[in-house]
Amino acid sequence: MSLVARRSLLALSIGTALGAADVRAETPTGGRRLALRGYDPVAYFTLGRPEKGEETFSFAFDDAVYRFKTAEHRAMFAADPERYAPQYAGFCAAGVSKGIKVEPDPEAWAIVGGKLYVVAQKEKIDEFKRDPSGFIGKADTNWPVVRESAPKVPAR
C-alpha cells in the first residue's frame, strides 16, 4: 500500500472513530445502555404493569439509564434503586439462566420475592412463572460471568 493510501486510510479511520465517539457522547443516555428499553421499573411495582418512561425523568444506575413515567417514580428509584431495578441489570432472566446475556421484552415480566425479572419473549414468561426458583437459581449462579459478557441479541 502506498504512503498516500495509508495516510488516507488512517485519516478516514480516525475521523470515523471520532465521529462515533461524538455521537455516543451526545446520546441522551451518555453512552450507557437504556435499561428496559425505556420502560419505568417503578411502574411494575406501583401500577402492576409496564409503562414507558419519559426521557425527562431519567436516572443512571449500574451502568444503565432508567426512564420513569413521573418525577415521583424517579425519586422513588433514586432513593432505593436496589428495590426497583430489575435483576441481572435488566437482561433476560431466562437467558442469564442459560449463560447468555439477552435484551428483554419489558412486557414479559414477573415480580418474584419482591424483585423484578424480565425475559426476552412473552411466550417465555409463563415458563418462568412455573419454575421461578429454578430459573433464578441458575441465573444467580451464572450472573457473575454473564455480567461481563456482551449481549447476544441487540436491543430493538
What are these regions (language model features)?
Residues M1-G15:
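N-terminal secretory signal peptides and thylakoid transit peptides that target proteins
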Residues A21-R156:
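Charged, low-complexity intrinsically disordered segments
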